[in-house]
Amino acid sequence: MGIKHLYQVIQENAPDAVKAGEIKNHFGRKVAIDASMSIYSFLVAVRSDGQQLMSETGETTSHLMGMFYRTLRIVENGIKPVYVFDGAPPKLKSGELAKRFMRKSEAAEAHEEAKEVGTAEDVEKFSRRTVRVTREHNEECKKLLKLMGVPYINAPTEAEAQCAVLARAGKVYAAASEDMDTLCFDSPILLRHLTFSEQRKEPILEIHLDRVLEGLDMDRKQFVDLCILLGCDYLDPIPKVGPNTALKLIRDHGSLEKVVEAIQSDPKKKYTIPEDWPYKDARELFFDPDVRKADHPDCNFKWEAPDVEGLVKFLVEEKAFSEDRVRNGAARLQKNLKTAQQSRLEGFFKPIAKTEQEKATLKRKHEEKLELQKKKKKEEAKAKKEAKSKPRGAV
């Protein structure tokens, strides 16, 4: 799930932190990809008539189709991926996982009902909500990656946290995930939409954490506190606290401790903190997650030549893929993994740090930009209100 409304908050308050571009812009870079999030998106997106793609024996193959062709696209654009798989979830996440399971069970019932009496759109909607990544999906994807010559790592717990470790250590350029909480784990750069299909024509979003903090005028602790307040996988959000309120509370009080204190001492009792709300434990999971250090042997990875006959045996003989397509894909993979050995020039240069004066100027310009945006929104809201209040037919 990640952090609710975080991307919206960044867009509105730190727009310079986000850079949209084409996949080819990342040629020559190594990227750590959140495998479980990618597999989930493959299961949801790679479908036929609202159903999972399946082999002749009734086995789901959407995850393998997605992993094979999306990885091929990434490699053909000169990127060297390393996939990171989730381990056991932290205990604090068990509540959120239980809720997700309940939602999927309810969706499964609604899906069956929709098949009986609903529209095609209803069937598709509820079918998507029942999607769950299983251990078997993960193991089959690991087998496929090994045959493709693409490395993978098993994280002790959260894949995003392990991706962030690799990015901070410079082993990869960025962490790639749709989960915004990757930034809470201190990944310097987050890439979104990297494993999306080409048909979706979504730009790759590159989010820089240092620019996020600069735009929000927060340190990392305040940023993590904001994310917890927005709503994360570890805790229920505080009822009635939306993104604008969460941002204001952190800016006014500076920390979650002081926010909680202010809410509890408010005589009007405007907000109610959930009874079991261990925000300090959640913060600790972001600051000290269970991860392997970048120099751990399990974090040493390399790209190999694909095992073409192994791919044919697995995908064609066992999963009924087209042999011509698999062999063609393997040949393209072999060719492009060699090409991706090239380095980017940026690896030889260090960015020049901004002076205090430059930082102050940028901050002032950013604040002026925000004020203009707020003014424009107010004017639009006012015009909308006036238009509604006019009698029908009035000019």
From Swiss-Prot:
Q: Which residues bind Mg(2+) 1?
A: 34, 86, 158, 160
Q: Where is this region: Interaction with PCNA?
A: 341-349
Pfam families the record matches: XPG_I, XPG_N
Q: Name one GO molecular function term.
A: 5'-3' exonuclease activity
PTM summary from the entry reads: Phosphorylated. Phosphorylation upon DNA damage induces relocalization to the nuclear plasma.
- Where do the record's region annotations for Disordered lie? 357-395
Enzyme Commission number, as recorded? 3.1.-.-
- Cofactor(s) this protein requires: Mg(2+)
What does the record's cofactor remark say about binding?
Answer: Binds 2 magnesium ions per subunit. They probably participate in the reaction catalyzed by the enzyme. May bind an additional third magnesium ion after substrate binding.
Any one of the GO CC terms: nucleoplasm
Would you say which domain of life the source belongs to?
Eukaryota
Q: How does it assemble?
A: Interacts with PCNA. Three molecules of FEN1 bind to one PCNA trimer with each molecule binding to one PCNA monomer. PCNA stimulates the nuclease activity without altering cleavage specificity.
Query: Which family would the database say this protein is a member of?
Result: Belongs to the XPG/RAD2 endonuclease family. FEN1 subfamily.
> What does the protein in this record do?
Structure-specific nuclease with 5'-flap endonuclease and 5'-3' exonuclease activities involved in DNA replication and repair. During DNA replication, cleaves the 5'-overhanging flap structure that is generated by displacement synthesis when DNA polymerase encounters the 5'-end of a downstream Okazaki fragment. It enters the flap from the 5'-end and then tracks to cleave the flap base, leaving a nick for ligation. Also involved in the long patch base excision repair (LP-BER) pathway, by cleaving within the apurinic/apyrimidinic (AP) site-terminated flap.
Matching entries from PANTHER family are given as: FLAP ENDONUCLEASE 1, FLAP ENDONUCLEASE FAMILY MEMBER
Q: What is this protein called?
A: Flap endonuclease 1
Q: Which gene encodes it?
A: FEN1
